From Swiss-Prot:
PANTHER family: DELTA-1-PYRROLINE-5-CARBOXYLATE SYNTHASE (PTHR11063:SF8), GLUTAMATE SEMIALDEHYDE DEHYDROGENASE (PTHR11063)
This protein's UniProt keywords: Amino-acid biosynthesis, Cytoplasm, NADP, Oxidoreductase, Proline biosynthesis
Physiological role: Catalyzes the NADPH-dependent reduction of L-glutamate 5-phosphate into L-glutamate 5-semialdehyde and phosphate. The product spontaneously undergoes cyclization to form 1-pyrroline-5-carboxylate.
Organism taxonomic ancestry: Bacteria, Pseudomonadati, Pseudomonadota, Gammaproteobacteria, Enterobacterales
Catalytic activity as recorded in UniProt: L-glutamate 5-semialdehyde + phosphate + NADP(+) = L-glutamyl 5-phosphate + NADPH + H(+)
Gene3D superfamilies (alphabetical): Aldehyde Dehydrogenase, Chain A, domain 1, Aldehyde Dehydrogenase, Chain A, domain 2
Gene Ontology BP annotations: L-proline biosynthetic process
Pathway(s) the chain acts in: Amino-acid biosynthesis; L-proline biosynthesis; L-glutamate 5-semialdehyde from L-glutamate: step 2/2
Entry's family note: Belongs to the gamma-glutamyl phosphate reductase family.
Keyword Cell wall biogenesis/degradation belongs to the record: no
Protein name: Gamma-glutamyl phosphate reductase
A GO MF label: glutamate-5-semialdehyde dehydrogenase activity
Length: 419
């Protein structure tokens, strides 16, 4: 039996035990994890420093370095996220619906854990803890495969999680990590459908494509965020600029940050010079369409010509595409062609245009007069998210606790037989 098969078998056995746990027991384990993350923070941060040093030496981009970094403040926030998961309602055992049938059978549909979750991710050390906490809360075991960039950080955090599980009398195999950087192990993992019930990739487009094409396990894809905001002709300029600032500048490396701004042609001459000045203050480079270029050049920001391929890629940096569109339908057409079904927004004072945009844009999250940065499990009140799904089955948008469960039908009878 291979190393991966041994992990899969241990995870499956652990999942049976987890499925039987009370909410109180699961919360106890999560509380111990949060406490140990703080008490063992020095070891985790030192491990992260090793990963950061190696990443810098390899020439990793600033956007990815930001994703890789664990600061004391970020680690403290992650520990608090685990405590927030403790406070969330446990979906396991919840009766979704039920009825008494004419046959006398009392039928109900009840939420249950999925079983074993596999998660493949890249330079995102927070994923280790976020995913583990959500899986434990929902009674699922998890096998993690982080990128080589996060090797030392993942080792340190999984060690803390397994220590907490043992302290609570739970199987450490409930949370396991594949430590070898061998890429062949990813291919093997994708075919372990006899042990793993759902696979979640969190990384670039290449990883998602690999999982879709080679996995024999049901895959939840998403997280690629070419997010748009359309500034309608009725938008309030100052309020619109505040939303754009938040969406682009708060955390440019996040998948829900703004990548392309679409501006109605009727306001372009007045709005774009102001936008250019505002973006200059934050060091944003504007990638302008030929129509937008002269208006943006009136402001102070650095402006370069947009390339056709720019509309289809995430910048994950202080760069923003700017395009002028004829009307709301042209904006919708642009989003349909270049969007990734993640998060898109309209800034408008027209109720009719707002409703038209919401109905026409087929993304997992659509906003009216709000920043795309809200697409987040914590912001949605779901707790730490396991991923943002941009597909329509089995989950869509930020995946919280409910998305890590399925359901079973349970029938109660009094020695009933079918007639």
């Amino acid at each position: 039996m291979s190393m991966l098969e041994q992990m899969g078998k241990a995870a499956k056995q652990a999942s049976w035990q987890l499925a039987m746990l009370s909410t109180a027991k699961k919360n106890q384990a999560l509380a111990v994890i949060a406490n140990l993350l703080e008490s063992e923070s020095q070891a985790i941060l030192q491990a992260n420093e090793q990963d950061m040093a190696a990443a810098r030496d390899s020439g990793m981009s600033e956007a990815l370095l930001d994703r890789l970094l664990l600061s004391p403040a970020r680690l403290a926030a992650i520990a608090n996220d685990v405590r927030q998961v403790c406070r969330l309602n446990d979906p396991v055992g919840r009766v979704i619906d039920g009825s008494l049938l004419d046959s006398g059978l009392k039928l109900e549909r009840r939420r249950v854990p999925l079983g074993v979750i596999g998660v493949i991710y890249e330079a995102r050390p927070n994923v280790t803890i976020d995913v583990a906490s959500l899986c434990l809360k929902t009674g699922n075991a998890v096998i993690l495969r982080g990128g080589k960039e996060t090797h030392h950080t993942n080792q340190a955090t999984v060690k803390v999680i397994q220590q907490a599980l043992e302290q609570c009398g739970l199987p450490p195999a409930a949370v396991q990590a594949i430590e070898s950087p061998d890429r062949e192990l990813v291919t093997q993992l994708l075919r372990m459908d006899n042990y793993i019930d759902m696979l979640i990739p969190r990384g670039g487009a290449g990883l998602h494509k690999l999982c879709r094409e080679q996995s024999t396990i049901p895959v939840i894809t998403g997280g690629i965020g070419v997010c748009h905001t359309f500034v309608d002709e009725s938008a309030d300029f100052e309020k619109a600029l505040l939303v754009i600032e938040n969406a682009k500048i708060q955390r440019p490396s996040a998948c829900n940050s703004l990548e392309t701004l679409l501006v109605h042609q009727e306001i372009a001459a007045r709005f774009l010079p102001i936008l250019s000045d505002r973006m200059h203050a934050f060091g944003v480079t504007l990638h302008a369409s030929p129509q937008a270029m002269p208006f943006l050049a009136e402001g102070k920001a650095r402006v370069v010509a947009v390339e056709a391929a720019d509309y289809d890629d995430e910048w994950l940096s202080l760069d923003l595409n700017v395009e002028i569109v004829a009307d709301i339908n042209a904006a919708i057409s642009h989003i349909r062609e270049h969007g990734t079904s993640h998060s898109d927004a309209i800034l408008t004072r027209s109720l009719g245009n707002a409703e038209h945009f919401v109905r026409a844009v087929d993304s997992s999250a659509v906003y009216v007069n709000a920043s795309t940065r809200f697409t987040d499990g914590g912001q949605f009140g779901l707790g730490a998210e396991v991923a943002v799904s941009t597909q329509k089955l089995h989950a869509r948008g930020p995946m919280g606790l409910d998305a890590l469960t399925t359901y079973k039908w349970i029938g109660y009878g009094d020695d009933l037989v079918r007639s």
